[in-house]
């Protein structure tokens, strides 16, 4: 038989047993929560273990796996993504923004090697693509501003010429200044006279002096200073004459001056490539070459030199002449100068004057690629020797 509850409903087997109203105060029994909606449950819950030990619940021990911590990546990548997302969001807002930009070019290198694409940003600001990465610190050199006094002091130091540029410089003969042929350069400078311009006196009708009664008054003369007396007694200064241009000197005048002066002077004498004279004899054996014939026999053939090579060997040069007197200089009454080399006559004329310095240097080379250079003197004049064709033709017709 099944028992019913207070409400008259049958109880299910194995379910919680209904409590009676009279059993509310029993010890160790927890009443079931009332089903009436108007009643609240008790604040303190009752224990059904009847004072026994609580049952332990066992939980499995899970072994935690150790994971090796990897170094964190730089946060700059996230920052770049955030900046790009912001730029994309900004481009979408507003009117006329975020439009695609098209750049047309004919070649790859048309914009130049250092030209970079520029992206249009907000607030009408151009942003380089290179600026999208992490910002780098740029050290800007600060220029020091000079005051007016420092600038004036630098100019004074530049204008100075009373100091030695090299403090360790010593007086050495090898460091002497170069001499240039500017002895007649004084005519380039203009000198002004200190005396005021005096108008020339024009001769006119002679005027008669008017007779005037001279009063008998004597003027007392004051003593003069020594400087004034010295100026009065000093002779007048001679007027400086500006040197004129150097005169064109003929060969005859030059040779006469050189014969009268005691100082020795070097002359540059230009001679023809080929000189009259006998070239030195050279014992040269003929060159023989072996040629194999059709029959297999070897034949020796002498090779003769070309005509030009023979003429070059028969020519006489200055190096082929012996040391000593080469010829004679003849000075005619007309001023013509000739050089006699055996039976050949050469005309001697003045060469073109040089505007630079010429020196005769003797160079002596050693075996170990070293040598010495000795300056023998300055060369001031140049003489050119050319063949006299009239005398050559007369000598040929004879």
Curated annotation (Swiss-Prot):
Subunit-level organization: Component of the RNA polymerase III complex consisting of 17 subunits: a ten-subunit horseshoe-shaped catalytic core composed of POLR3A/RPC1, POLR3B/RPC2, POLR1C/RPAC1, POLR1D/RPAC2, POLR3K/RPC10, POLR2E/RPABC1, POLR2F/RPABC2, POLR2H/RPABC3, POLR2K/RPABC4 and POLR2L/RPABC5; a mobile stalk composed of two subunits POLR3H/RPC8 and CRCP/RPC9, protruding from the core and functioning primarily in transcription initiation; and additional subunits homologous to general transcription factors of the RNA polymerase II machinery, POLR3C/RPC3-POLR3F/RPC6-POLR3G/RPC7 heterotrimer required for transcription initiation and POLR3D/RPC4-POLR3E/RPC5 heterodimer involved in both transcription initiation and termination.
The gene it comes from is POLR3D
Q: Which GO terms describe its cellular component?
A: cytosol; nucleoplasm; RNA polymerase III complex
Reported function? DNA-dependent RNA polymerase catalyzes the transcription of DNA into RNA using the four ribonucleoside triphosphates as substrates. Specific peripheric component of RNA polymerase III (Pol III) which synthesizes small non-coding RNAs including 5S rRNA, snRNAs, tRNAs and miRNAs from at least 500 distinct genomic loci. Assembles with POLR3E/RPC5 forming a subcomplex that binds the Pol III core. Enables recruitment of Pol III at transcription initiation site and drives transcription initiation from both type 2 and type 3 DNA promoters.
Where are residues bearing Omega-N-methylarginine located in the sequence?
95, 97, 99
UniProt PTM: Sumoylation on Lys-141 can serve as a signal to mark misfolded Pol III for proteasomal degradation.
Can you cite a GO biological process for this protein? tRNA transcription by RNA polymerase III
**Name this protein carries in UniProt:** DNA-directed RNA polymerase III subunit RPC4
Keyword annotations for this protein, in alphabetical order, are: Acetylation, Antiviral defense, DNA-directed RNA polymerase, Immunity, Innate immunity, Isopeptide bond, Methylation, Nucleus, Phosphoprotein, Transcription, Ubl conjugation
Q: Which residues carry this modification: N-acetylserine?
A: 2
Q: Give the protein family.
A: Belongs to the eukaryotic RPC4/POLR3D RNA polymerase subunit family.
Q: Which GO terms describe its molecular function?
A: chromatin binding; DNA binding
Q: Identify the stretch(es) annotated as Disordered.
A: 1-114, 220-244
- Name the predominant localization: nucleus
Name the InterPro entries on file.
Answer: RPC4
Q: Which residues carry this modification: Phosphoserine?
A: 42
Short name of one Pfam family = RNA_pol_Rpc4
Compartment annotation: Nucleus
PANTHER family linked to this entry: DNA-DIRECTED RNA POLYMERASE III, DNA-DIRECTED RNA POLYMERASE III SUBUNIT RPC4
